[in-house]
Amino acid sequence: GKSSFDERNPLSLGSANRTAPKTVWKYLGDSDTIFAIGSSLTITNYGITIPSGKNIIHSTNNYEDINKDYDVEVSLLGDSKLVLQKMIECIKNNYSKNIASLEKKNIVMSEIKKVKEEWASEWNTLLNSPMNPINPYRLVNEINNNIDHENTIVTHDAGHPRDQMMPFITATTPGSYIGWGKSTHLGYGIPL
């Protein structure tokens, strides 16, 4: 989910439903491999579709998810936390001490930063709009700029609030952003 990875990390692209930061769209298009972890990879009108031609590594705890809607090259059946720990261990052992890998990582981080800056510039007018009544993107931006991210849990209601908040709220710690998936009735985004 959105708050499983600190979005201040220079390698963070953000997360997606029907809306997403520009970084998600760019790297979803540019990548040759997608690593999906803790996801059913279900094709839905409420999420993004993985473009054809991508190599997919799919980690899930439910064997019925594998090859359900997408053909995957590698399936990793197991607990997401354990799979991630093993993947991180593998990357550290094989790539983290390699100078070429470190140089490539720095280039990628620089590219991600540039795309984030472009995207922020494109949205600046709406995010800081003086419109009256207040523009919903301005409201989301004000919330994002004024909360204590480490000690606040942000959520949204169904419909447009989800699409307006998800790309612009910065999730920092696990559980700091709780998104309600797919379709819920207005006013019932949080289980009662």
Residue ranges and their predicted role:
Residues 113-191:
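Active-site diphosphate/adenylate-binding microenvironment
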Residues 2-111:
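Glycine-rich, acidic loop regions that bind phosphate or pyrophosphate groups
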